[in-house]
Design a protein with these regions (language model features):
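Core catalytic region of metal-dependent phosphoesterases/phosphodiesterases
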Residues: 34-151
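Short, glycine/serine-rich, charged loops/turns that create anion-binding
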Residues: 29, 55, 122-123, 163-165
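Short, flexible loop segments at the rims of nucleotide/cofactor-binding pockets, characterized by
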Residues: 24-31, 92-96, 164-165
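A short acidic, often aromatic-flanked loop/helix-cap motif at beta-alpha or helix-coil junctions
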Residues: 17-18, 147-150, 166
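Short hydrophobic segments within beta-strands
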Residues: 25, 50-51, 118, 159-161
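Binuclear metal-dependent hydrolase catalytic cores centered on His/Asp/Glu-rich metal-binding motifs
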Residues: 132, 136-139, 151-169
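Structural motif
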Residues: 20-22, 46-47, 156-157
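Acidic, histidine-bearing metal-coordination/catalytic regions of metal-dependent phosphoesterases
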Residues: 1-34, 41, 62, 75
Length: 169
């Protein structure tokens, strides 16, 4: 986020019988969510959609989990990318992130509106404590999944497409 929060408003004709206000948040990268939360409280969205990169999860030999349906080949490739990321940190230096900011964002956002999160290219995996905070905050993880949501007497479908980890960033 680099201390920059941008609000862009769009009005889209959806054909739904009622108006929905959606808050779309992306690329927090474990930065202070204060400004984002302030905007979300101000616009009072019906749903909050998180389009990836809330957490910085790459590199290392951590106790990790990408998703319950991860196959052995995907797991092997993810672990290979994690090792490459470790090498990049040795060569270029380790960056400072604060995972507490991501946890605070999800907890506070969940008090504003239902939250749906799709992983981004910086979220190669989730730690068990990340999944715990999603559960505790009521955040619905959409990792190549969709779900039906009943809101304002309407049923809508929300889906999340996961990013393939990208080491070029």
């Amino acid at each position: 986020m680099k201390d920059k929060c941008v609000l862009t408003e769009y009005t889209i004709s959806s054909g739904l019988p009622r108006r929905l206000v959606l808050g779309l948040v992306s690329d927090l990268h474990e930065s202070d969510p204060k400004d984002v939360l302030e905007i979300l409280r101000k616009i009072s969205p019906d749903l909050i959609l998180v389009a990836g990169d809330t957490f910085e999860r790459h590199g290392g030999t951590k106790d990790t989990q990408r998703g319950s349906d991860e196959g052995s080949v995907e797991r092997m490739l993810r672990h290979l990318l994690m090792k490459l990321d470790d090498i990049f940190e040795v060569v270029f230096g380790k960056r400072d992130f604060n995972p507490e900011y991501s946890r605070r964002f999800l907890m506070e956002a969940g008090k504003i509106a239902p939250v749906f999160l799709s992983p981004g290219n910086h979220e190669w995996y989730f730690l068990p404590k990340d999944l715990d905070i999603m559960k505790e905050s009521g955040t619905k993880l959409l990792d190549n999944r969709d779900c039906k949501v009943y809101i304002k007497d309407m049923t809508i479908r929300i889906g999340g497409l996961s990013s393939v980890p990208d080491i070029r960033w």
